């Protein structure tokens, strides 16, 4: 007891003495003051030139004020990227396919643990370069409105609601839960109407309708700001209604800050401020572009155009107070990250470097890959028998690390390719591998002549009991503004949704051998595999599944896991005439507005078991807009093996004049059920939130009184239960 009192006394004396010491020093050095006060004090002590230097992503040290050098640019889309070894989780589109927000939070927590641990180690070594910081430019919550967009793989799909829920979970996992200090900063990008074409992103001007803007392009950003409390928002390259998205007062001030109450900081996409005068030709000089961006609400410039701000102030293009306001936002963020406080005050400073690539994170990467895999077709071929004797694994993405990773990835310590996964899962089988075909015409996949590679693959298939064809895409073909020009691909985007011809031809030849074929697809976007759907007995969609992707695919093939991923995008048929890629109108796009029959609908995914739905109940069949409606139902595993089901709730307006969408996702639950097990699932509907539409006449959101339908299903096209209710007039 005496020792405990003595320790308490010493701690109290330390706090009192520290408080006295802090009161005698500069305000910005006092951790007892709030971060905004400290940031404002620090900014007030800088010269104009020093202020300007801190508003570019490469911010130099200011030794006289104790400010260390810092580079704001860091990437963490599905793992810490470009900073050495780090756990690589499935690409973002694959994480979205899990329909599992709790898992997403765990993944983001693991990413941020590794990021903070790396930062701690970099600090000990005095390192302050790019990819060594705490401000991460993820997640990408743009809407994957068109399957041709190469960066769609970075998103959470085509649906605003799913994107919002997965994005919130990611942000909260990244930023941590300490009441004072952030673990790191997440950044919602690219605000707000941005989804290709990649080759035109520095030049094109988007003119979305107000309905599309407020019902499709803005909701996820609003959710991440207001519910997720995201610390940063990144502007896009393109123009929106004539103004650069990175210098757009309506987006950055009126909507983001005034309407939504955003109190974080904004950052331009890299060299987007330069685009203002070099490519958009909005103003003629760097000084005018920099001044326009700052005055429009852009705090941080990724690039160096803000170097012109000093001259811009001297020329009267903006006031130094405009600089002060923006920089105070930025320095507040650095204080909140603990960059100016003793490490013992910042709980995240104790994260050890050993968390990187830890066994726990590796296991989580495997689980995430397991949950992301989508079973698209199964005519009873899967799961494969463990007693199979001879397996032919064929295809250009079977024994390659690239299709595991997608873009914006780190360096995994021990990645498992799909071929390696199959060999490990079938140790007693003879597993023969053949590359078989080039990824696409123009990319050579080995030393063999294409005809020789094809013949080798066919020989392997004819001698096998089962053929596993692994093909699709890699991030060498689809991604961000790439120097790519191959059949079906241009500039990072796709010009053809079909499987590359070299692969399609080999797949058809393999099927013609008469041996059972499983098609495993690696991709970050929809593939129009119409022929395979008609002829191949089993199709498994792996996405870009991360470092343990090969293990996860093999587990699904052999039934060690039961695939339960669901499509976060629509897969269109090969002959579907899509709207022009550069047309941002939502009419005819995504499951919400598409009137045709898709190859695979949004939310689709098969299982090795069967699920039965029953007993849908609403606690009221009439409600005012401000009320809440509780929805309950039961789901039962009616099959013979355990599995996950993703229960999906859609709402459909039944009345005119605003029967505007086919249906909209407004809830989902991933539940695990043993054979014969039944579980109750519940949702809450808030008409004011879940049924609102944007009223052009009122320039505001509204809820129409009238009839609506609750639809419970296993996908957007597989509705099992329905019940109607009425929203009464206010």
Task: Go through each PLM region and give its residues.
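Bacterial N-terminal signal peptides that target proteins for export
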Residues: 1-10
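Extracellular/periplasmic metallocenter environments
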Residues: 699
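Glycoside hydrolase catalytic-domain context in secreted enzymes
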Residues: 2, 22-693, 702-716
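Bacterial N-terminal signal peptides
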Residues: 10-19
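Short beta-strand elements
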Residues: 718-730
């Amino acid at each position: 007891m005496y020792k405990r009192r003595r320790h308490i006394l010493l701690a109290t004396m330390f706090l009192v003495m520290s408080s006295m010491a802090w009161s005698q020093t500069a305000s910005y050095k006092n951790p007892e003051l709030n971060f905004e006060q400290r940031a404002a004090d620090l900014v007030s002590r800088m010269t104009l030139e020093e202020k300007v230097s801190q508003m570019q992503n490469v911010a130099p040290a200011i030794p006289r004020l104790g400010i260390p050098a810092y580079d704001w640019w860091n990437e963490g889309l599905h793992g810490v990227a470009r900073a050495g070894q780090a756990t690589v989780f499935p690409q973002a589109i694959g994480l979205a396919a899990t329909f599992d927000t709790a898992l997403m939070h765990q993944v983001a927590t693991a990413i941020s643990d590794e990021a903070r641990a790396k930062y701690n180690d970099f600090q000990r070594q005095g390192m302050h370069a790019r990819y060594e910081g705490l401000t991460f430019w993820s997640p990408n919550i743009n809407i994957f409105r068109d399957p041709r967009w190469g960066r769609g793989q970075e998103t959470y799909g085509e649906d605003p609601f799913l994107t919002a829920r997965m994005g919130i979970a990611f942000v909260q996992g990244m930023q941590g839960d300490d009441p004072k200090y952030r673990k790191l900063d997440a950044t919602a990008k690219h605000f707000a109407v941005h989804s290709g074409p990649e080759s035109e992103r520095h030049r094109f001007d988007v003119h979305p309708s107000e309905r599309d803007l407020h019902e499709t392009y803005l909701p996820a950003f609003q959710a991440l700001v207001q519910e997720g409390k995201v610390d940063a928002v990144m502007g896009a390259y393109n123009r929106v209604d004539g103004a650069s998205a990175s210098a757009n007062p309506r987006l950055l001030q009126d909507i983001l800050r005034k309407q939504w109450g955003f109190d974080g900081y904004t950052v331009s996409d890299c060299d987007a401020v330069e685009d203002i005068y070099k490519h958009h030709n909005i103003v003629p000089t760097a000084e005018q572009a920099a001044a326009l961006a700052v005055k429009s609400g852009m705090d941080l410039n990724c690039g160096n155009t803000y170097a012109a701000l000093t001259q811009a102030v001297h020329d009267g293009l903006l006031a130094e107070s405009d600089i002060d306001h923006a920089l105070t936002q930025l320095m507040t963020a650095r204080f909140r990250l603990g960059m100016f406080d003793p490490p013992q005050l910042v709980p995240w400073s104790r994260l050890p470097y050993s968390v990187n690539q830890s066994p726990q994170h590796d296991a989580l990467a495997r689980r995430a890959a397991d949950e992301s895999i989508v079973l698209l077709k199964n005519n009873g071929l899967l799961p494969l028998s463990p007693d199979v004797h001879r397996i032919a694994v064929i295809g250009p993405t079977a024994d390659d690390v690239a299709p595991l990773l997608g873009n914006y990835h780190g360096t995994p310590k021990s990645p498992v390719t799909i071929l390696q996964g199959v060999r490990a899962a079938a140790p007693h089988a003879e597993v023969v591998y053949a590359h078989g075909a080039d990824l696409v015409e123009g990319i050579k996949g080995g030393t063999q002549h294409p005809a020789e590679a094809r013949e080798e693959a066919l020989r392997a298939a004819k001698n096998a009991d089962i053929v596993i064809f692994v093909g699709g895409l890699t991030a060498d073909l689809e991604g961000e503004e790439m120097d790519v020009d191959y059949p079906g691909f241009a500039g990072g985007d796709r010009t053809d949704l079909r499987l590359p011809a070299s692969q399609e031809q080999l797949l058809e030849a393999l099927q013609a051998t008469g041996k059972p074929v499983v098609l495993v697809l690696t991709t970050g976007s929809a593939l129009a595999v119409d022929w395979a759907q008609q002829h191949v007995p089993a199709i498994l969609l792996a996405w870009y599944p991360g470092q343990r992707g090969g293990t996860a695919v093999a587990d699904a093939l052999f039934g060690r896991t039961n695939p339960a991923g669901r499509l976060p995008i629509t897969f269109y048929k090969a002959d579907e005439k899509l709207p022009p890629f550069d047309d941002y109108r939502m009419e005819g796009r995504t499951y919400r507005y598409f009137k045709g029959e898709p190859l695979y609908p949004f939310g689709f995914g098969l299982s090795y078991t069967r699920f039965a739905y029953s007993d849908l109940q609403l606690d009221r069949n009439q409600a005012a807009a401000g009320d809440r409606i509780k929805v309950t139902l039961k789901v039962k595993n009616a099959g013979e093996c355990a599995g996950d089901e993703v229960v999906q709730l859609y709402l459909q307006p039944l009345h005119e004049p605003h029967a505007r969408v086919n249906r909209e996702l407004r809830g989902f639950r991933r539940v695990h059920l043993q054979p014969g097990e039944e579980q109750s699932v519940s949702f809450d509907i808030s008409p004011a939130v879940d049924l609102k539409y944007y009223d052009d006449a009122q320039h505001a959101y509204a809820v129409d009184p009238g009839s609506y339908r609750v639809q419970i299903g296993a996908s957007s096209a597989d509705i099992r239960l329905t019940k109607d209710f009425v929203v009464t007039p206010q």
